Swiss-Prot record:
Belongs to the ATP phosphoribosyltransferase family. Short subfamily. The keyword Aminoacyl-tRNA synthetase does not apply. Keywords: Amino-acid biosynthesis, ATP-binding, Cytoplasm, Glycosyltransferase, Histidine biosynthesis, Nucleotide-binding, Transferase. CDD domains: PBP2_HisGs. One of its GO terms (biological process) is L-histidine biosynthetic process. It is an enzyme of class 2 (transferase). The lineage of its organism: Bacteria, Bacillati, Bacillota, Bacilli, Bacillales. This is ATP phosphoribosyltransferase. It comes from Oceanobacillus iheyensis (strain DSM 14371 / CIP 107618 / JCM 11309 / KCTC 3954 / HTE831). The keyword Phosphoprotein does not apply. InterPro entries: ATP_PRibTrfase_cat, ATP_PRibTrfase_CS, ATP_PRibTrfase_HisG, ATP_PRibTrfase_HisG_short.
Amino acid sequence: MQPVTIALAKGRPAKQTIKLLQAAGLTFEELDATSRKLVFYNEDRTARVIFLKGMDVPIYVEKGAADIGIVGKDNIIESQAEVYELLDLGIGKCKFSIAAKQGVTLSSDNEITIATKYPIVAKRYFSKRNQSIDVVKLNGSVELAPLIGLADYIVDIVETGNTLRENGLEILEDIETISTKAIVNKASFATRSAEIQSIINRLSTVVG
């Protein structure tokens, strides 16, 4: 039988996730967040961890290439993947927020321009406000957009807000708090329920 495959977001998020796995007694040979390896097996090879870009984790899980994924809610929302969310791991907590240049207020007008790495989040939020928006999809340095006139506002993930303040921006409104989730492929949960639930249960004991 194929090992249960657990997809992790590589890079900085992996360090916290690996600590959780280890605390839950889930150990994998040579598993290290800084390793260039992408696949790690447990001792009896009944489970394996794979490292992916965060945005790809929900896709691998949805398509069945991974049974379980541990990834930020931001990536789950933006991927629009059809998966089960089984557990909030309580790590990687931050907020989706709307920000603009200091002194600017949040307009209720239509056709405002939003710069963001998260167009799904932005469109969903402003749709609830019955506002039509023009979204500029960026991949980095979102804070720059209002400063040079590319956008009226930004929607971004905020932890401390220091980067915004250093660039003359301020938070106008928080959209929602997000954190790291354990997600599961729907078919896998039906066919490998005992194995998957065992892993989820072990994780749940260390996250309270």
